[in-house]
Design a protein with these regions (language model features):
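Rhodanese-like catalytic fold shared by cysteine-dependent sulfurtransferases
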Residues: 1-48
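ATP-dependent adenylation/nucleotidyltransferase module used to activate substrates
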Residues: 42-181
Length: 181
């Protein structure tokens, strides 16, 4: 609460209220981010600069730890061949977003052409979760294709292993969608 955070600050403890929970805080950050700039810089310009900074860190700071190993694995096991169409499925988490960026980087430097498609399956997210995924994809320059399902509704009343069933159904939908492409 605001009151609790104020009491902690009075005692010299840095604190703030997370009114609306983590999602509320995250939306505040997204709004602040869209207002950043020197007055002349637009939201798109600010996002573009942030995207470039992130991509530069992948290329420079994390090149050896991430990209070199990723590219070596792709090449050693011949996972991508000329003319392939690859669907990168994005959950919205850091792992799938990073995987998408690594594939974009691979395509940028690869010796042969291949296609990339970035899929996001909405199994019944609330508006806030979906907005965060879309915002982060836009920020990172990942052109996502979103398709909706009602998986969350389908497993809502399942008592035994709903997480297992949900995961299987999500994979099934993703495989089907990837085959359509």
């Amino acid at each position: 609460s605001q009151e609790g955070a104020g009491m902690l600050r009075e005692k010299g403890i840095p604190a703030r209220s997370l009114k609306g929970g983590y999602t509320g805080w995250l939306f505040q950050q997204m709004q602040k981010e869209s207002k950043k700039g020197d007055g002349e810089e637009t939201e798109n310009e600010a996002m573009e600069q942030r995207r470039k900074d992130i991509e530069l860190s992948i290329r420079k700071k994390f090149h050896k730890q991430l990209f070199t190993r990723f590219a070596r694995g792709i090449n050693d096991y011949e996972l991508v061949k000329p003319g392939d169409k690859i669907a990168v499925c994005i959950s919205g988490g850091k792992d799938s977003m990073l995987m998408a960026k690594l594939f974009q980087e691979l395509k940028r430097h690869n010796k042969f052409p291949f296609e990339l498609v970035f899929l996001v399956m909405d199994p019944g997210y609330n508006e806030a979760n979906r907005a965060v995924i879309e915002h982060n994809a836009k920020l990172l320059g990942i052109p996502i294709t979103v398709f909706e399902t009602e998986i969350f509704d389908a497993v809502y009343n399942v008592e035994k292993s709903p997480c297992y069933l949900c995961a299987r159904m999500r994979r099934g939908y993703l495989y089907s969608k990837a085959k359509e492409l």
